[in-house]
């Protein structure tokens, strides 16, 4: 098991999403862990947009990525929208950089031109399949194919002069032991003969992910590459690329997967739809409308706190932490390799805790933005209501469910609660409620008056208050009698 001893040096990390659609919480957690490791050492968090595949790019996706990071309080130090010494920060604007670097690899003999057409490669695959084999473009097959390794320099020069289409492939060495090191998963070894000669530069002159990724990480002086587990199979190739260039490798860390609640399969949009919960931080309004955690009433503090626990936990055992405290306590070495199950109920628990510590005025503003009816309420009254009910709310949306009866007549009445109300004395109770409304001095005076009348008539204070609560709330749950009376009854005439 590899053991990397860190010194408290500044770290440059990057989050490098592709704008191919909305970024779900797996990507957000990757961004969060990168951000935490940078801020813990006073380093830099870079947002780099990997948009070389224009065919898959989705309009609005880059803005969505920036918006969700900002909502969570994760602000890049360097990005397409900020100035930085290592830009541009969109890969589509860095083709001149990749052209220079690919030439260096070709000139040093670590990469070569391949002129095979798609049809010719398809034919090779078909022939191999007939023999029960798998076609791999590598040390065994490359010299029988159309490339600068199997042709003379004159033939290659002639094809290039004529404008023959080509790709640039990486020359993977034969039978070399590749040692990879990962903070989370330790050391591993792989034989290079298992790898194919990956395309580094496509026929249209754009780089592939692997090439652009390594070049940018080096030129942007990235010290730690923290990314998802799905990139583990690419690690050996990336190590070879660093060695071919003669560059120092960054420290790698591959984060564990986030699984469905039942532990079966990677968390996805479909699993969220089936489970009735979002998997995206904020609403996505592309061709397909997708609901976000923000619009479901989750606070960014609650979401960030929960995501931090998916694969990591603080040594001191504390659970409820804001972004500042997470930054202070986070240790990349404590991230585990085992996958984490997504638990929406646990997320709501974290959200509940953060609602308790959030100013009621801020909660009221958020509630107004999410609920049309709440938007019609005078803010001061809504703040008072939120203060009364927030102890029982798991989401911002819950606040309205708990407080709406304070401003509107109940839309329905709970059947079990109605059965506990005395039908015989109901008319008398309602009449007395109206009478007490007219002559009360205060909310507490109103409640005491009703209790006194209940004792005097023999109906009983308990039955009086139960009936009053059902009339006002539609059920037997709610805030204290004095509180809801103060908020629900109109001013004394």
What are these regions (language model features)?
Residues 6-133, 233-244, 302:
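N-terminal Rossmann-like or analogous alpha/beta NTP/dinucleotide-binding catalytic cores
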Residues 289-371:
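A conserved active-site cap/scaffold subdomain adjacent to cofactor or substrate pockets
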Residues 293-301, 337-343, 376-384, 455-463, ...:
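Structural motif
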Residues 307, 351, 386-389, 393, ...:
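Short alpha-helical scaffolding segments that buttress acidic/His motifs in well-ordered protein cores
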Residues 368-450, 456-457:
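Small-residue-rich helix-loop
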